[in-house]
Swiss-Prot record:
Residues 50-60, 231-253 have a biased composition (Gly residues). Component of the Mediator complex. GO terms for molecular function: transcription coregulator activity. Signal peptide: none annotated. The gene is nut2. Residues 34-47, 88-104 have a biased composition (Low complexity). Component of the Mediator complex, a coactivator involved in the regulated transcription of nearly all RNA polymerase II-dependent genes. Mediator functions as a bridge to convey information from gene-specific regulatory proteins to the basal RNA polymerase II transcription machinery. Mediator is recruited to promoters by direct interactions with regulatory proteins and serves as a scaffold for the assembly of a functional preinitiation complex with RNA polymerase II and the general transcription factors. Its main location: nucleus. This is Mediator of RNA polymerase II transcription subunit 10.
Length: 253
């Protein structure tokens, strides 16, 4: 009896079924809804998965049941790919020299298949308990970015809006920091004037919060006030001088 073998066409069909099941699962996940009455019936489903349920129209299944059925269909498709790949004829150069290693290879393949099925169920089944798998993990993608891509929008728009949001948040935080700093200096000056015996404690608290001492802060504010008044007075005197000079020229004419 000749051994049963598979063709490359059958292997390609099995891979196409896996891709179709992955597409159906992606659509179901993107349209996930826990309400059975609002489940989307326009979602493309695999003909292999819905072949036995075409006659039942009594009620709508929830998204959770549909996703579970899609996962089962995907599991069956992956198993079909594995079995078809094992039935493909091997090249003459890669064939074993005798029949003894072939039995060991078959056992090894079975062990690898069982390990793969266990790992797949633990890592890809959302209803299975989470099992930590060693190795590098994929970086998390922000949900808003996925929404932008699904809606056909440019991801650069998300980046630009994110930068603008961060800039506004930084400006707001900077304004709050300056406001609290000014309030700290004013409160320290008032407490120093009302409670002179706590001068050292007030100075220590102000310095611990990143500010100058009350005396230094008051001196700096006094200097700024004097400079501002002098500059304002100089501008006022200059304006008066120019006005008097203009009046003198008009009277001379």
């Amino acid at each position: 009896m000749a051994p049963v073998t598979a063709t490359h066409q059958e292997a390609q069909e099995s891979v196409k079924n896996v891709i179709q099941d992955l597409l159906n699962l992606m659509v179901q996940v993107s349209q996930y809804d826990t309400n059975p009455s609002s489940s989307n019936n326009n979602t493309p489903t695999s003909s292999r998965a819905s072949g036995g349920g075409g006659g039942g129209g009594g009620g709508h299944a929830s998204s959770r049941d549909i996703i579970a059925q899609s996962l089962q269909t995907l599991d069956a498709s992956l198993l079909s790919v594995y079995r078809t790949a094992n039935l493909l004829p091997s090249s003459p150069s890669s064939g074993p020299s005798n029949n003894q290693p072939q039995q060991g290879t078959t056992e090894l393949e079975r062990a690898e298949a069982a390990q793969f099925a266990s790992t797949f169920n633990n890592t890809h089944n959302p209803y299975a308990p989470h099992v930590h798998q060693p190795g590098p993990q994929n970086p998390g993608i922000p949900i808003p970015l996925i929404t932008y891509v699904e809606n056909g929008r440019n991801p650069d728009v998300y980046t630009r809006e994110f930068i603008e949001l961060v800039r506004r948040s930084n400006q707001l935080m900077r304004g709050k920091m300056h406001a609290f700093r000014d309030f700290r200096d004013v409160l320290a000056g008032e407490m120093e004037a009302a409670l002179p015996e706590l001068r050292e404690d007030i100075k220590r608290v102000v310095e611990a919060t990143g500010g100058p001492g009350p005396a230094e802060g008051s001196e700096e504010r006094a200097r700024e006030g004097v400079v501002g008044s002098l500059s304002a007075g100089g501008e006022g005197q200059q304006g008066q001088g120019q006005g008097q000079q203009g009046q003198g020229q008009q009277s001379g004419q």
